[in-house]
């Protein structure tokens, strides 16, 4: 049995991050019928479905329906998001019975050169992940930009520290260097993700 399987429910995204190579494919969103057909074929192959490859999953107009399908079929569902749409989708995620984990790529703010208010962005993320984590959903705040300029990291860490009333970077680390901000809510640090080069020779 595979540890996890990724399904791209949409290749549309509302950002253009420098760490993502994007796609030349036409914009496409998987229908609930297509999704259920695929999910049925994956039963017994894995317990965990990650609804993300390229694209922003929170852009899917029928995301609650997809999450209901995964729950009905017995999967544990994980989402990876840039976080910009969390204020809009928070209630839908809170009511989704099959959501197991939500990962938020905080480094997308810097990676996409967003010109908006970072504090407002972080507030929108925090106001979503806090009640989700309190409900028992695992929430990971990702800073996967080790080895890059990290221009926004100090402001992000300062914001998180203010929310928990202690220095987030002084919290104990696990074996992977991650820190627990509160129950079910984690800060993940890692090197910048490198997308596989499909044209590179096999090694």
Q: Regions from the language model: what does each represent?
A:
Residues 30, 73-76, 96-203:
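Radical SAM enzyme [4Fe-4S]-AdoMet core and its adjacent flexible, acidic
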